[in-house]
């Protein structure tokens, strides 16, 4: 079936748990083929690239997703990749922007807690 949301949701849920990453990557790529330019799918692809250890590609994709749609969950993902590459000031700035938009976002809160970051 050509249901990009379903491919993306399944791929993202696998990637977020670091499960079956090659399968997650394939599912998300399929979703992006069906809905090119969708920032949420681009975010998912960036997230799976990060989980696969491809930080440069992850950063490129997550920056693109965030520029297209500055969503708090995308901010959480972009900030984490920035943080792990040493761009900590930029990560904090992105996270603060995300918090201003949605202070109660669970993904952002979990990310900051796991990385032990205080904003």
Language-model segments: what does each one mean?
Residues 3, 12-13, 38, 47, 71-72, 80, 105, 114:
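Residue-level recognition of tetratricopeptide repeat
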Residues 6, 41, 74-75, 108:
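TPR alpha-solenoid repeat register
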Residues 15-16, 50, 83, 117:
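Specific register positions within alpha-helical solenoid repeats of the TPR/Sel1-like families, i.e.
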Residues 34, 67-68, 101:
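Structural marker of alpha-solenoid helical repeat scaffolds
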